[in-house]
Structures are given as structure tokens and as C-alpha cells.
């Protein structure tokens, strides 16, 4: 027990760092949501990972940036004739978004190098966090890849690329937060016994939450939250009539606004049902209640966002809380792994 406590104290700085990295990712998700809802994401038309750290410093610099923006479809279709002050406002929102992304990278990379060289983290953890670093580099490219889709013909980004951008953020968050939970949750000498299927059940819920977050990105990218602003019915219907008007039929799942919103609603209710069942079956395990509370709050935020036609503050909270819900599920899974025991599951009985 003393050895375990000593290890825990030594790992505390690493745990704090991983927690900070997780919070930074959630902060980025919130800022990204604000940038999108403020329609500021296409105001910076170039990707300069190094030299783009500084904003325009002179009137001439600002004029050059505005001229570049005036060549974009968004300016011509939506913001034609905006003043320099209006342009600066949207430009600075996107600039802060990119600046915080760079800061997040530094918050991760510099301590990662230090802890690795000082051997404060095991080789296994180094490999996992190096994977997170690779995903971070990919995420930076994906962000520009998304923005680029709105600079060509249409004045909005591809909802597929938006979903990719959000999914990569979720993967990075998962790598940081699960490792943080692994440091924080101490193994118990006497472990609580659970059903052999519980961990698999939680894994299924995690996959469904991930799919739900992807469809949330589709809803955002297609502006699907601006239709059927009623709940629980969709303008008086359980199943709206226009779910399958696109051809081929499968395309409706990804590009029909009504279908995408319907799937997003259905997945929310499915996840809620599964979490309630999980809670009932594991009522003696306290972390499951965090998971249940998270899914209830997330659904309430989603319904309010829909009914009030996407108010910015509530919509951002809904996006951010999707990561908190995912994190609470990861926490419960890590808790099960470290503080419970279960019999070996036999899926194919002899």
C-alpha cells in the first residue's frame, strides 16, 4: 500500500498535466463551436502554422487580409461590403481559435518531452501519448482541410470535414482523459464483482456516443437544427415524411437534413435508455451516476438548443457537454477495469 501511495504521488504532476491537456481540448471544442456559430471560420484564408501566430500588425496588413477574404465565396454571397471593423471582428475570432490550438499543442508537447526524458512516464504510456501527438498533427491539417472546403465554390464548409475535425478532437481527448483516469483511479485490494458483460456494455455505449457526436457534427454542418424545432414530435410527426427523398436512398442518412436530425434524436433516446439500464444493473457503483447525470444534462441541452433555434451559448454548451458525456463514460470504463472484477465471459458455449 505504501509503495502504491508513493507511485501515486510521483505520478501526480503527470496526472495534472494530462488533466490540463484534456481541459484544453474541451476549450478548443467550445471555441471552435463559437467560431462556427459566429460565421467567422472562413475569415482567415491561409494556413500558416508558424508565421500565422501573429495577427496583422499594421493597417496595410489588415487591408491585405481583407482583400484575400473578399475573393472568397462567403464574402461575395453573405458578407459583401462589410466594413474593416466588421472584418476584424470575425478575423480575430478565428485567430483566437487557431492561437489556442497552437497553445494546446505547446501545453502537450513541452511537458511530454520533459516527462519522457526524466522517465516519469512508462514506455507504454509514451507510445500512447505519441499516438496522441500524431493525431494532434493530423487534427491541425484536418482543420485547414475543413476550412479549405468553404473557400472554393460554396460559402460553407463540408459537413463531412467538420465531422472529421470533431472526431479527431474526440480521439485526442479520449487518449488524454483515459490516461488521466488511469493515473487517478487506484486499484482496490478487494474488488467489487460485476457481471461479465458490463465492460462490453459500456464499450457499446461509448461507440454509440461517438457516432452520436459525428451526427451532431452533421446536424451542425447541414444546419439541420433549424428545421423541426419541436420536441418530442417532429412538427407533429413521430417519423417525418421527408426522410428518404434523396436518391440513392442511403444518401439520406448523411445529407438529408430531416434524416440526420431524426437519427440524432433517435440515438439520444437509445443512449439514454442504455445508460438507465446500466445504472439499474450497477446501482452500487457510484461513477455510473455521473454517466447518467451527464446524458440527462446533454439531452436537455440538445432539446433547448432545438426549441430555441440554436442560441449560441446553449449550442456551444451542448457541443462541449458531448465530450464531458464521453469522458464520464470513459471514466466509468476505467473504474470498472481497476476497481472491479468479473468472470470470464463465454460467448460461444461448448
Curated annotation (Swiss-Prot):
Give me the residues that bind heme, please: 264, 318
Q: Which spans are transmembrane here?
A: 14-34, 95-115, 125-145, 162-182, 202-222, 260-280, 296-316, 317-337
Task: State the Gene Ontology terms under molecular function.
Answer: metal ion binding; oxidoreductase activity, acting on NAD(P)H, heme protein as acceptor
Q: What the protein does?
A: Catalyzes the conversion of heme O to heme A by two successive hydroxylations of the methyl group at C8. The first hydroxylation forms heme I, the second hydroxylation results in an unstable dihydroxymethyl group, which spontaneously dehydrates, resulting in the formyl group of heme A.
Q: How does it assemble?
A: Interacts with CtaB.
Which family is this sequence assigned to?
A: Belongs to the COX15/CtaA family. Type 2 subfamily.
Q: What is the recorded name of this protein?
A: Heme A synthase
Which species is this UniProt entry from?
Wolbachia pipientis wMel
The gene from which this protein is expressed is ctaA
Amino acid at each position: 500500500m505504501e509503495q502504491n501511495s508513493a507511485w501515486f504521488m510521483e505520478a501526480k504532476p503527470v496526472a495534472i498535466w494530462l488533466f490540463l491537456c484534456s481541459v484544453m481540448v474541451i476549450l478548443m471544442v467550445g471555441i471552435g463551436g463559437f467560431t462556427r456559430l459566429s460565421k467567422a471560420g472562413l475569415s482567415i484564408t491561409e494556413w500558416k502554422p508558424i508565421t500565422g501566430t501573429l495577427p496583422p500588425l499594421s493597417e496595410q496588413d489588415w487591408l491585405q487580409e481583407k482583400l484575400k477574404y473578399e475573393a472568397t465565396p462567403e464574402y461575395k454571397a453573405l458578407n459583401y461590403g462589410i466594413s474593416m471593423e466588421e472584418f476584424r471582428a470575425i478575423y480575430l475570432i478565428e485567430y483566437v481559435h487557431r492561437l489556442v490550438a497552437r497553445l494546446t499543442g505547446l501545453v502537450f508537447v513541452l511537458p511530454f518531452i520533459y516527462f519522457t526524458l526524466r522517465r516519469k512516464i512508462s514506455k507504454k504510456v509514451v507510445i500512447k501519448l505519441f499516438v496522441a501527438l500524431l493525431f494532434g498533427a493530423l487534427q491541425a491539417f484536418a482543420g485547414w482541410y475543413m476550412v479549405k472546403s468553404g473557400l472554393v465554390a460554396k460559402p460553407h464548409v463540408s459537413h463531412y470535414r467538420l465531422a472529421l475535425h470533431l472526431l479527431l478532437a474526440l480521439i485526442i481527448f479520449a487518449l488524454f482523459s483515459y490516461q488521466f483516469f488511469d493515473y487517478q483511479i487506484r486499484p482496490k485490494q478487494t474488488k467489487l464483482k460485476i457481471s461479465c458483460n458490463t465492460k462490453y456494455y459500456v464499450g457499446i455505449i461509448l461507440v454509440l456516443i461517438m457516432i452520436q457526436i459525428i451526427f451532431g457534427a452533421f446536424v451542425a454542418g447541414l444546419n439541420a437544427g433549424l428545421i423541426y424545432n419541436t420536441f418530442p414530435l417532429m412538427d407533429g410527426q413521430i417519423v417525418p415524411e421527408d426522410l428518404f427523398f434523396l436518391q440513392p436512398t442511403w444518401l439520406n442518412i448523411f445529407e438529408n437534413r430531416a434524416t440526420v436530425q431524426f437519427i440524432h434524436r433517435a440515438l439520444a433516446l437509445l443512449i439514454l435508455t442504455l445508460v438507465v439500464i446500466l445504472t439499474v444493473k450497477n446501482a452500487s457503483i457510484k461513477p455510473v451516476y455521473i454517466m447518467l447525470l451527464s446524458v440527462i444534462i446533454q439531452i436537455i441541452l440538445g432539446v433547448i438548443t432545438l426549441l430555441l433555434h440554436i442560441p449560441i451559448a446553449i449550442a456551444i454548451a451542448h457541443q462541449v457537454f458531448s465530450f464531458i458525456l464521453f469522458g464520464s463514460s470513459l471514466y466509468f470504463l476505467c473504474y470498472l477495469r481497476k476497481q472491479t472484477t468479473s468472470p470470464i465471459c463465454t460467448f460461444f458455449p461448448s
